[in-house]
Regions:
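Membrane-helix interface segments in multi-pass membrane proteins
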Residues: 43-80, 122-160, 215-265
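Juxtamembrane transition segments at transmembrane-helix termini in multipass membrane proteins
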Residues: 5, 63, 87-100, 163-183, ...
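Nonpolar helix-loop interface/hinge motif
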Residues: 1-56, 157-235
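Hydrophobic alpha-helical transmembrane segments of integral membrane proteins
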Residues: 72-80, 109-133, 197-206, 210, ...
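Central hydrophobic cores of alpha-helical transmembrane segments in multi-pass inner-membrane proteins
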Residues: 12, 78-91
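Cytosolic-side membrane-entry/anchor segment at the start of a transmembrane helix
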Residues: 19-33, 89-121
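Membrane-interface segments at loop-to-transmembrane junctions
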Residues: 63, 100-109, 185-197
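Hydrophobic alpha-helical transmembrane segments
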Residues: 15, 30-31, 74-75, 108, ...
Length: 298
C-alpha cells in the first residue's frame, strides 16, 4: 500500500487518511486479513455459544453445575488474544516493509507485554477492592459501601485504560522499526507514547465510540437472537414453559455471530489504520523536535 506515514496530522486528518487507505485498498485488505478475521469470528462464536450454554447452568432442571462452558469460555478468551496478535500482524503487514514472520513474532511479543501489564493492573485493583471490602467485614453493608466499591472499580478501570493508551504508539513503533528491540526500548517507546498521549487519547476515544456505534448496528441480528434466547429461558425458569425456540437455533446463533464478527473485524482494521497515522504524526513531531535541538546545540 502507498502511504505517507511520517507527516504532521491532526486527529481528523488521521481519521480521514485512514478512511481513504481502507477505501482505496479494501480488496487488498480483505485478502490480507480474511484468515485471522475468520478465525477470530469462529473463536468469538465458540465463546458466545459457551456463554449461551452456561445460561442453562442456572436452571433448576439441571441438578449439577456444568463447568465445561466456563472452561471453554476461558480457553476461547485466551485463544482470542493470540488470534488478535495474528490479526494485528496481518494488518500491519499491509503497510510494513518487514516480513510477515517478523511482524507476527513482534506482534505476539508486544501483545504478551500488554496482557501482563493489564493483568498486573487488574490484580492491584482487585487487591484494593479486597482491602475496602475487608474494612467493612463487621459493618452493615449500606448503599454508601456499594457506591464506594463501584466508584473505586470504575476509577481503576479508567486509570488502566488510560495507562494502556501509550501502548498504541509502542506497538506501532516496535512493529515498524526493522531493528528495534522490545527488551531494550520498551520503556523509551512507552515514554514517547506518553508524550504523544493527546493525539493517542483522542484517537482511542473516537475509535472506541465509532466501534461501539458500528458494533451495535453490525451485531444487531446476534443481539436479537440472544434476546430471544434470554426470553425463552426466563419463561422456562419462571413459568415452566417449554422452549419455543426452533431446533436449529444454536446453528443460527453461531452462524450469525461468525458473520457479524467477521464484518466487525473490518472496523478493527480501520482502527489500526487510525493509530498507524497517529503514530506517524507523533514520529514527525519527535523528529522535528530532535532536529530543532540539534540545530540549537550547534
Amino acid at each position: 500500500m502507498e502511504t505517507e506515514l511520517i507527516k504532521d496530522r491532526s486527529l481528523s486528518s488521521c481519521i480521514k487518511t485512514a478512511n481513504n487507505l481502507l477505501g482505496v485498498n479494501f480488496a487488498k485488505t480483505i485478502k490480507g486479513t480474511w484468515l485471522p478475521a475468520l478465525l477470530i469470528a469462529i473463536m468469538t462464536a465458540i465463546l458466545g455459544f459457551s456463554i449461551l450454554q452456561s445460561l442453562h447452568s442456572f436452571s433448576p432442571t439441571i441438578p449439577e453445575y456444568d463447568l465445561f462452558p466456563m472452561a471453554l469460555g476461558i480457553v476461547s478468551w485466551l485463544g482470542s488474544i493470540a488470534l488478535w496478535a495474528y490479526f494485528f500482524a496481518s494488518v500491519v503487514n499491509l503497510v510494513s516493509e518487514s516480513s510477515f514472520k517478523q511482524n507476527l513474532r513482534r506482534s505476539f511479543a508486544i501483545t504478551a507485554v500488554e496482557l501482563i501489564f493489564y493483568l498486573v493492573m487488574m490484580a492491584i485493583g482487585g487487591a484494593i477492592i479486597r482491602m475496602v471490602v475487608m474494612s467493612y467485614i463487621n459493618k452493615p453493608l449500606t448503599p454508601s459501601f456499594f457506591t464506594l466499591v463501584g466508584g473505586i472499580s470504575l476509577a481503576w478501570i479508567l486509570l488502566t485504560a488510560l495507562l494502556m493508551v501509550p501502548f498504541r504508539y509502542a506497538e506501532m513503533r516496535y512493529l515498524l522499526s526493522p531493528t528495534g528491540s522490545l527488551r531494550r526500548n520498551l520503556i523509551a517507546y512507552y515514554v514517547s507514547g506518553v508524550r504523544g498521549s493527546g493525539l493517542l487519547i483522542g484517537s482511542s476515544f473516537f475509535t472506541a465510540l465509532a466501534s461501539i456505534c458500528l458494533g451495535l448496528v453490525i451485531f444487531l441480528p446476534t443481539i436479537i437472537l440472544l434476546g430471544a434466547k434470554t426470553s425463552s429461558l426466563i419463561g422456562e425458569l419462571t413459568l415452566n414453559d417449554p422452549s419455543g425456540l426452533p431446533t436449529y437455533f444454536n446453528a443460527l446463533f453461531i452462524g450469525s455471530l461468525v458473520l457479524t464478527t467477521f464484518i466487525f473485524m473490518m472496523v478493527m482494521v480501520w482502527t489500526v489504520f487510525v493509530f498507524y497515522y497517529a503514530y506517524g504524526s507523533i514520529e514527525h513531531r519527535r523528529q522535528m523536535k530532535k532536529q530543532r535541538q540539534a540545530a540549537t546545540a550547534e
